[in-house]
C-alpha cells in the first residue's frame, strides 16, 4: 500500500510539473524584407527603417499584431497588415516603419563599418511557450534601394533568446530570470568615404600647408611666420570641433582625434623650429638658419605625409 501511495504522489508531482510548464511550445516562422533605411543620425544614435514582416504559427493566442515588441525601437508605426487564419494556422503580414536606437563604432570614422540591428519578440509569451525560427527563403532587403553614402555588405537573419534578469514580479520558483525567443536582423554597411574625407579634413590640411609655407618666408618676416602658424593652430582646433559636433561622444581615440592631434603637434614643432631659426638670425647666422629651415621643412613634410598615410590605411584596411 505504501508503494502505491508513493507512486501516486510521484505521478501527481510529475503532472503538476507538466502543468506548470504552460502551453506546449509552438514554432513561429518569421521573415523580413527591408525596403528602406534612411535618416542615419550619428549624433542621436538612431536610424529609420521600413520593412515588411510576416509570421506563420498555429497558436492564435500569440496575437503578434498586438503583442509584437521591438526592444530597441524608439517608435513603431504599423500599416498594411493582413491576417489569414485558414488551413489551421495563422499567417500575419504587415509593414512597419521604425526609428531604431543603436550604438555606432566611430573609431575609424569616416572609413567606418556599421552593423544595423533589428530584434523582435512576443511580449506576452516567453521561450517556454514559443520558439522563433527565421524564414530564410528569398532575399531579405531590396537591392534597389539606395542608402546614400553607404554600401550594403550583407543582411543576416537569425533567431535566439533574449535573457531578462527578472521574473517581472511573477512567481517563477524563486528564479529571477526570464527568457524570450527572438528574431534578429543584422545589416552590415560600409561608408563610401572618399568625398566625405576630403570635405571634412580639407581645412586641416590647408592649415598644415600654410604652416609649412612659413619655412619659405624670408627671415626678415619672422612675425608673419609666427602669426600664420598660430592662426593655423586655431584653424585646426576649429575644424575638429566642427567634425566632433556631428559625432556621438566617444571615450576612445578615433581617427579624427589622431589626424588632428598629429597636425597640432606638427604645427607646434614648426613654431619651435621658427623660434630656433630666430635665435640663429639674432646671432647673424643667416645661412645656418636657411639651411636649418630647408632641412626641417623636408623632414616634417615627409613624416607628416607618411604618418597620415599610415593612420588612414590602418583605419580603412587594417580592421
Where are these regions (language model features)?
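Channel- or pocket-lining gating/hinge segments that regulate access to a cavity or pore
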Residues: 184-303
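Sec/Tat signal peptide C-region and signal peptidase I cleavage site
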Residues: 15-20
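Sec-dependent N-terminal signal peptides
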Residues: 4-13
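Positively charged n-region of N-terminal signal peptides that target proteins for export
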Residues: 1-4, 303
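Juxtamembrane boundary at the C-terminal end of a transmembrane helix
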Residues: 310-319
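Soluble non-transmembrane domains of integral membrane proteins
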Residues: 21-188
Amino acid at each position: 500500500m505504501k508503494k502505491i501511495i508513493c507512486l501516486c504522489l510521484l505521478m501527481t508531482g510529475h503532472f503538476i510539473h507538466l502543468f506548470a510548464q504552460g502551453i506546449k511550445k509552438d514554432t513561429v516562422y518569421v521573415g523580413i524584407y527591408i525596403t528602406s533605411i534612411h535618416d542615419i543620425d550619428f549624433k542621436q544614435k538612431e536610424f529609420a527603417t521600413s520593412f515588411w514582416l510576416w509570421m506563420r504559427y498555429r497558436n492564435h493566442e500569440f496575437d503578434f499584431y498586438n503583442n509584437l515588441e521591438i526592444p530597441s525601437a524608439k517608435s513603431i508605426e504599423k500599416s498594411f497588415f493582413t491576417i489569414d487564419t485558414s488551413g489551421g494556422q495563422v499567417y500575419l503580414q504587415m509593414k512597419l516603419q521604425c526609428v531604431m536606437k543603436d550604438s555606432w563604432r566611430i573609431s575609424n570614422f569616416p572609413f567606418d563599418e556599421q552593423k544595423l540591428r533589428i530584434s523582435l519578440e512576443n511580449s506576452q509569451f516567453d521561450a517556454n511557450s514559443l520558439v522563433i525560427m527565421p524564414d530564410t527563403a528569398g532575399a531579405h532587403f531590396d537591392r534597389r534601394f539606395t542608402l546614400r553614402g553607404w554600401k550594403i555588405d550583407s543582411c543576416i537573419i537569425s533567431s535566439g533568446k533574449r535573457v531578462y534578469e527578472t521574473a517581472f514580479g511573477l512567481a517563477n520558483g524563486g528564479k529571477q530570470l526570464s527568457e524570450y525567443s527572438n528574431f534578429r536582423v543584422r545589416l552590415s554597411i560600409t561608408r563610401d568615404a572618399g568625398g566625405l574625407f576630403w570635405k571634412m579634413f580639407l581645412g586641416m590640411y590647408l592649415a598644415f600647408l600654410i604652416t609649412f609655407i612659413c619655412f619659405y618666408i624670408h627671415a626678415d618676416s619672422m612675425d608673419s611666420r609666427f602669426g600664420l602658424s598660430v592662426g593655423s593652430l586655431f584653424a585646426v582646433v576649429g575644424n575638429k570641433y566642427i567634425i566632433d559636433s556631428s559625432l556621438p561622444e566617444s571615450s576612445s581615440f578615433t581617427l579624427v582625434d589622431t589626424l588632428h592631434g598629429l597636425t597640432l603637434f606638427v604645427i607646434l614643432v614648426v613654431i619651435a623650429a621658427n623660434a630656433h631659426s630666430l635665435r640663429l638670425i639674432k646671432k647673424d647666422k643667416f645661412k645656418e638658419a636657411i639651411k636649418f629651415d630647408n632641412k626641417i621643412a623636408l623632414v616634417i613634410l615627409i613624416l607628416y605625409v607618411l604618418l597620415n598615410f599610415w593612420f588612414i590605411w590602418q583605419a580603412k584596411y587594417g580592421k
